[in-house]
Amino acid sequence: KYIRSEELGLSFNRNKGLLVADGEIIGFPDDDCEYQDETLEKVVNFFLENEEYKIFSCRTLEKGKDYGTGIMAVEETDLKYKNVEETVKSITFFVNFQLEDLTLFDPNLGVGSHFGSGEETDYVLNLLHKGFKGKYFPNEIIYHPAKKGNYEDVERAYSYALGYGAIV
């Protein structure tokens, strides 16, 4: 489904989408990320073959580069409280929900809010707290521009730092 919103706030708008979603597997792509041809098929098959898992996460890289947004783990691993920061990025995870398990993002976190980042970390930590199990696959890639080295965008850096600080 495509829903257009005039209101700012990444988490606020993701929540709007979650509330009208009619599927069970939910992903959170950006408009500038790119899935590989088989990404969605792999996600669906993972959930079908591993019913105890409810979160699938993978790596992000800038296309044609050996780096991506932030530092990510290089080994396949279960998601744990202590490794969410290096195994989950906003665009790299999918959740297999049942309606009664629906969880919303904190609208105070993420782009467009005062605390301009950290929404995905907070979200996955909440899911783990609810008993969800997740798996990280470093060899599965979602491409996304890394936006590295833009040291002149102090406002963006400040907003992201506030979000990170709110999480830690």
Question: Which residue ranges define each predicted feature?
Answer:
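Conserved donor NDP-sugar-binding/catalytic core segment of glycosyltransferases
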Residues: 38-71
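Short aromatic/hydrophobic "clamp" motif used to bind/position activated sugar donors
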Residues: 26
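Short, flexible, basic/aromatic active-site loop/helix in glycosyltransferases
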Residues: 69-100
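Catalytic core of nucleotide-sugar-dependent glycosyltransferases
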Residues: 151-168
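Catalytic beta-strand/loop signature of glycosyltransferases that borders the donor
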Residues: 107, 131-143, 157
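Glycine-rich, basic loop-to-helix element that forms the pyrophosphate-binding segment
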Residues: 5-21
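Acidic donor-binding loop at a coil-to-helix junction in glycosyltransferase catalytic cores
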Residues: 110-125
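The conserved acidic donor/metal-binding loop of glycosyltransferases
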Residues: 30-34
